Amino acid sequence: YYASRGLGDVYKRQLTTRHDRYTVFSLWDTFRNVHPFFTLAYPQKQLDMVQTLIDMYKEWGWLPRWELYGNETLTMSGDPAIIMLADTWLRGLKKFDAETAYEAMIKSATAPGSENILRTDNDDYMKLGYVPLREQFDNSVSHALEYYLADFALSRFAESLGHKEDAQTFAKRSLGYKHYYCKEFGTLRPI
C-alpha cells in the first residue's frame, strides 16, 4: 500500500516486533471503548498492541489509523493512534517506548498537509485553528473534531513526559472546536 504512495516498498521492510504482534486496528472506532477496556481487563495485550503501533511507526514512518493485515488503509478520519497511546500511558500502563511514541505523535500532529498521510488538511488546521469547508459534504468539521481530541490527548501525554511547552501548545489547539459552535442553532457547523 505505501509503495503506491511513494513511501517505500512494503514487501521489503524489516519487521521490528519482539513481542506478540497485532493487526486489523480499526483505531477510529476502537480508541473510544475497546482499548480503554483492554487497559483494565487485558493490560499485557494492550501493551503489546501499543508496542505494535510503535513498531509500525518505525517500519512505515507513521502511526496507523485503520491498519488492515499489515497495510494502512487510510480509511476514516482523524489521528486516533495518538489518543490510544496517550490513554494507555495515562491509565498507568507505561512499559512501552514512550519517547518513540511521542516522536511519532509530534510528527503526525505537526507535519505539513502535503507530507502528512494522516492529516492532509493540517496546513489550514495549524494556521487557522480549524479545517475550513472547501466543498459541500467535505467532512471538515469531523476531521477537525478528531484532531482536537488527538491534540488534547497529546497535550496530556506531553505534560506527563515533562514537555511543558508542547503540552501548552496542544492544549490550546484542542480548544479550536469553539470555532465551529453556532449560538443561533446550538450546534457545531462548517465554516
Go through each PLM region and give its residues.
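Alpha-helical support elements that line or immediately flank enzyme active sites
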Residues: 23-46, 86-91, 152-161
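Catalytic cores of carbohydrate-active enzymes
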Residues: 64, 155, 161-191
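Helix-terminus loop motifs that line ligand-binding clefts
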Residues: 45-125, 185, 189-191
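Sec-exported extracytoplasmic/periplasmic mature domains
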Residues: 39-42, 54-58, 90, 159-160, ...
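Solvent-exposed loop and edge beta-strand segments that line ligand/cofactor-binding
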Residues: 19-26, 70-78, 136-147
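Acidic/His metal-coordination segments adjacent to aromatic residues that form catalytic metal sites
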Residues: 12-16, 60-68, 124-140
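Active-site-proximal structural scaffolding
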Residues: 26-30, 42-46, 77-82, 94, ...
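Single conserved hydrophobic/aromatic residue that forms the stacking wall/gate
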Residues: 1-7, 11
